[in-house]
Regions:
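Conserved beta-strand core positions
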Residues: 26, 43-45, 73
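Short hydrophobic/aromatic patches at helix-to-coil boundaries
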Residues: 88-96
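Metal-dependent nucleotidyltransferase catalytic core
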Residues: 1-4, 10, 49-81
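Basic nucleic-acid-binding interfaces
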Residues: 15, 19, 53, 94
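Helical scaffold of the NTase/Pol beta-like nucleotidyltransferase catalytic core
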Residues: 1-26
């Protein structure tokens, strides 16, 4: 199964997991969003965490998401993006 099929097949489960953590507006960016992903590419997620979300909760969500999908993932929030990359990420981000 390629990376795009994996994402599609796990979409409902990802949304349930996100709901448990209060995560909203889940988008994908990076090589997967640009359709340039390779067999070992990770999946970059852009999300909105609830106000006051701790770094530990962020890390727990990322770990559980990676385990669910069976691939390395990176999870970023819009607020956590560096100013230099924010515009590019926002332009290429696509809804899950």
């Amino acid at each position: 199964m390629d990376i795009y099929q994996v994402i599609q097949s796990k979409r409902s489960e990802v949304l349930l997991l996100a709901g448990r953590f209060g995560v909203k507006n889940i988008r994908i960016f990076g090589s997967v969003a640009r359709h340039e992903a390779r067999a070992r590419s990770d999946i970059d997620f852009l999300v909105e965490f609830p106000p006051g979300t701790s770094l530990l909760t962020h890390a727990a969500f990322q770990r559980e998401l990676s385990e669910l999908i069976g691939r390395d993932v990176d999870v970023a929030s819009v607020k956590g993006l560096k100013e230099q990359v924010r515009h590019t990420v926002m332009q290429e981000a696509v809804p899950l």
